[in-house]
């Protein structure tokens, strides 16, 4: 958790870390997160540069900075708006899959795919829960949101 500690990465730093990581680990699948603090045009350019440097996947972020004004579903959309916008913009310029992460929920996961993401990251939506049953329920809910399927009731 770099942001709570005040640690901000600029584009040049992310690019250099990517190059060094790729040089050390040439055969691993490398996913790199584009910092949401960059202006959108810089996020797009960084994504292109990261692919040139060897990134196999580009991940967006942004939900940690969003402060929703509304309750309910609208608040969930407001929270996810920065990462959804980044996924839309970056997927338009990226030659590799884009993963949309940060602040996603069952309401916004389908929006991420519609925005151009190839996949989603929902770690904190699950990891913040203390109960394994609740974790399973959240994962199932997210899967249903992605597939649009609802299990048959007996």
Where are these regions (language model features)?
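Alpha-helix-loop-beta-strand connector modules within alpha/beta enzyme cores
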Residues: 9-36, 74-100, 137-154
